[in-house]
Amino acid sequence: MATILLSSRLPTTGTATPSPTRPAPRFLSFPGTAIRRRGRGPLLASSAVSPPAPASAAQPYRALPASETTVLVTGATGYIGRYVVWELLRRGHRVLAVARSRSGIRGRNSPDDVVADLAPAQVVFSDVTDPAALLADLAPHGPVHAAVCCLASRGGGVQDSWRVDYRATLHTLQAARGLGAAHFVLLSAICVQKPLLEFQRAKLKFEEELAAEAARDPSFTYSVVRPTAFFKSLGGQVDIVKNGQPYVMFGDGKLCACKPISEEDLAAFIADCIYDQDKANKVLPIGGPGKALTPLEQGEMLFRLLGREPKFIKVPIQIMDAVIWVLDGLAKLFPGLEDAAEFGKIGRYYASESMLLLDPETGEYSDEKTPSYGKDTLEQFFQRVIREGMAGQELGEQTIF
């Protein structure tokens, strides 16, 4: 079985047996025997697509047509991950998608559901929190040329953030490098630029690991994609307002703003990172088209689309401060309340901090300096949800309202 060395930094010493593509990274060590998983073999579903021939040193993978490249995707059943898989397939890439045996909100999707949803990608069911199992499950299906990590903790709890946003993401990097990946795309978040929450600190810690690996190995590159708000995170009140209730916001509704981006547009931007050399070894903040919108403007838009007079409930932000203060105090006495306190801080953060680029010169969030991409608008999304509901856009454990 593969021996995987974990640390807060990717080690720079050790030995490795060469892979078909190039020597495996030095933080992975392979004995001379084949990798085997204890117990039953991995649960695997495949479209019977053969692995690609490895790209030679004289012909980097970016010189190959998409049809001759394989991209590893973890978090493939998540909100953005599914669209990334579909977009890569649409562009002709071979996709190796990692999924849990039960996925979706509250694990409602079976393995057969996942295989059908991601077809014709090759799907490997594995556990990204178990580095040895992940590598063993993926090893028979390499090599890969690039990897995309769309993993994210479900609710942002303290332990879960470090388990998923850092360690499981690190396991993805280790497995991808062991399979020969020359480029790694990380789906991060624009809010990490002002890290006050555990999941932000965990994501930043991995971003450091990624940059360190690129500095160690010049043949390896990365792209860190930091999107603004997703459409679904702004759609939770559509049905409430549609049913005649007021729109709820904090303060005067102008405390924060964002340039929301659709899942399709974000997936296309992530797919661009696979081949676009200009996006290599860069942190890439990205928002959707148009100007930044405050909660007040979002609410006004929704009432206009419904043809109704605006009705708002404005909640003082100080209420959240009081709740957080109480939960923080209780968490010191009762550690089981640690996540409840963290969830309160997450709600407070999103109620008051803009999902825009933080201008280092002014220390202020900047609409103008936040890059825009794509064609889908929040207004189009609201129109669709008014007609069809939030099917496929459920918030699950991210629900605030």
From Swiss-Prot:
UniProt keywords, alphabetically: Chlorophyll biosynthesis, Chloroplast, NADP, Oxidoreductase, Plastid, Transit peptide
Principal cellular location given in the protein's record: plastid
Pfam families to which the protein is assigned, alphabetical: NAD_binding_10
InterPro entries registered for this protein in UniProt: DVR-like, NAD(P)-bd_dom, NAD(P)-bd_dom_sf
GO BP, one annotated term: chlorophyll biosynthetic process
Domain of life: Eukaryota
Pathway membership: Porphyrin-containing compound metabolism; chlorophyll biosynthesis
Biased composition (Polar residues): 1-10
GO CC entries: chloroplast
Class of this enzyme: oxidoreductase
Residue segments, region Disordered: 1-26
Transit peptide: 1-54
One annotated GO molecular function: 3,8-divinyl protochlorophyllide a 8-vinyl-reductase (NADPH) activity
Catalyzed reactions per annotation: protochlorophyllide a + NADP(+) = 3,8-divinyl protochlorophyllide a + NADPH + H(+)
EC number: 1.3.1.75
Role description: Catalyzes the conversion of divinyl chlorophyllide to monovinyl chlorophyllide. Reduces the 8-vinyl group of the tetrapyrrole to an ethyl group using NADPH as the reductant. Can use (3,8-divinyl)-chlorophyllide a (DV-Chlidea) > (3,8-divinyl)-chlorophyll a (DV-Chla) > (3,8-divinyl)-protochlorophyllide a (DV-Pchlidea) > (3,8-divinyl)-magnesium-protoporphyrin IX monomethyl ester (DV-MPE) > (3,8-divinyl)-magnesium-protoporphyrin IX (DV-Mg-Proto) as substrates.
PANTHER family linked to this entry: DIVINYL CHLOROPHYLLIDE A 8-VINYL-REDUCTASE, CHLOROPLASTIC
Protein name in UniProt: Divinyl chlorophyllide a 8-vinyl-reductase, chloroplastic
Annotated gene: DVR
